[in-house]
Every structure is written in structure tokens, then in C-alpha cells.
Amino acid sequence: MTMPDYDLIAILGPTASGKTPFAAALAAELNTEIISADSRQIYRGMDLGTGKDLEDYTINGRQIPYHLIDIADPGYKYNVFEYQRDFLTAYETIKQKGCLPVLCGGTGLYLESVLKGYRLIPVPENQELRVRLAEKSLEELTAILSSYKTLHNSTDVDTVKRAIRAIEIEEYYAKTPIEEREFPQLNSLIIGVDIDRELRREKITRRLKQRLDDGMVEEVRRLLAEGIQPDDLIYYGLEYKYLTLYAIGKMTYDEMFTGLETAIHQFAKRQMTWFRGMERRGFTIHWVDASLPMEEKINFVKQKLKEF
């Protein structure tokens, strides 16, 4: 099919919605490449814990090229400013081949940072603010964060450290006039994968059990043995938080499993809250039922491309 006037197709959805196999099948159909929008899959060696599922990028024996996966070492604190830079590099590489890039992921902050069309600026540390917030609980910090109207909110913020950093960024933006930087205004077709809540919960639990069977605990122990500090792994949240606490003896296996399962369910709910927030902020998201056959989902996107 002829390429439309869109600059980008974005496939977004909560964890366990099947967005990656969908994006890969679509990329195969359109003969293009994928740019990941996942804040943790950028780390090398953090595979099971981030749910990379790299086999999803092979369609009928053909490897679909992907970008922004395995680009940083564990322990490094990659940020949204670097993501914007690296996204543009990948985007321009794909466009130079005459292809329509497919952006795929569930990290709302990363998705919105490139779909919004303005460059974010690095925010310095505010030690005074950090001291002031140090004694607050995650719940109190989340309440503070939810009062802000701009890009950051509670998605991807499941540790106190991340919440404080997000508040630090919001405070800086509130007090510092931000001139909008050069960033391409991308005309994006945004497709959301809508999965039934109960089905999503079933898939999350099943997937968690499978990844534990596949060696997710051993992956965390290996990272610790390689010298990654426990606090640095805990910083990444979710699987790495709970599995590290289990690996260093701060939790029993049952406590780890129950706590992690609950945290992933809550995370998926926050992802959907973010995507609904994007719609309120003016983004048009075309939702497709996750349970549809793959061919129907691909045809749904093709139809949207033709409608432009």
C-alpha cells in the first residue's frame, strides 16, 4: 500500500495488552521498523524483568528491526531528555529508508514526550526540595504529583525516589519559563490497544508466573552479582523492586509474588489513566479491541491510514 501523509504510527496500551506482537505484525505488513517507548527495556541484561519478549519481533521467520532496546547499562538512570534525543535519531534513520516508523510502548511519559512536539529540558537536582519531601510516603507524594497539570503524573512512579524526582521536575517547570525547543511536529496515527480488565488481570498473573519459571529471580541475582547495587535495581520499580527485596532477604517468596502481582495490576491501571489523560490533553487515540484476530487489527490500522 502507498505510504500516507502520516509521519508515525504509535501503538500504545497497558502491560499485557499484546501491543508488541501487534506492532511487530503491523511493521512486517508495512515493511518498516519499530521504535520502543519503554523506560526499562532500554537496559541491557534486564530482559525477563522488563518483559522484552524479543521473540515477538520475529514474524514468519523474519526479524523486524527495532530501536531503543538494549541501549544502556543496568544501574544507569536514563531519562526522558535522552529518550527524545535517541528517538529522533532512530526516527530519522527509519525515515531515510522511506519507511513509516512504528512507535510501540506503554511508558506514557516517553510516548507523550515525542508525540507532543516540543523538547523537554534537563532539570537540575533541588536538594532543598528533596530534604523537604524525604519523610513523605509514596501515597503522600503521589497526591502532590496528581495536583500538577503537565506532563508528569503518577504513571511509572512506584518508588519514593521516582516520585520525588517527578515532583522536582514539575516544580522546576512551574518556576522556569520554558521556551519550546525545536522538535519536529509529527503527524501521528495513534492506536490504543484496549483489553478487557479481567482478561488483562488474567494475562498479567499468567505472564508473571511464566517469567518466574523462566528465571526472573536468577536474572536479578546475576545483576546483583555483577555489582549492580540493590538500591539501583529497586529504583527501576515493579519486578526489580520486589525481586531485589526477595533476593537480599527482605521478603519471602510469597510476599514478593503477592506484592509484585498487585503492583503490576496497579501499574496497568495507571497506564490506562495516563492514556485517558492524553485524550483529555487533545490527543486522538483510535482504540482497537485486543481480543480481535491479528489480521483484523492490522486491517483496522490500514483503514485509518486510508482515512487520512
Swiss-Prot record:
Catalytic activity annotation: adenosine(37) in tRNA + dimethylallyl diphosphate = N(6)-dimethylallyladenosine(37) in tRNA + diphosphate
Site residues (Interaction with substrate tRNA), renumbered to this chain: T107
Enzyme class: transferase
InterPro entries the UniProt entry points to: Dimethylallyltransferase, IPT, P-loop_NTPase
Interaction with substrate tRNA: region residues: 38-41
GO biological process: tRNA modification
E.C. designation(s): 2.5.1.75
Cofactor requirement: Mg(2+)
Parts forming coiled coils: none
This protein's UniProt keywords: ATP-binding, Magnesium, Nucleotide-binding, Transferase, tRNA processing
Positions annotated to bind ATP: G13, P14, T15, A16, S17, G18, K19, T20
KW Nucleotide-binding (keyword) present: yes
Binding site for substrate: T15, A16, S17, G18, K19, T20
SUPFAM superfamilies (UniProt xref): P-loop containing nucleoside triphosphate hydrolases (SSF52540)
GO terms assigned for molecular function: ATP binding; tRNA dimethylallyltransferase activity
Pfam families: IPPT (PF01715)
Family note: Belongs to the IPP transferase family.
Complexes and interactors: Monomer.
Job description of the protein: Catalyzes the transfer of a dimethylallyl group onto the adenine at position 37 in tRNAs that read codons beginning with uridine, leading to the formation of N6-(dimethylallyl)adenosine (i(6)A).
Protein name per Swiss-Prot or TrEMBL: tRNA dimethylallyltransferase 2
Species of origin: Bacteroides fragilis (strain YCH46)
This protein's encoding gene: miaA2
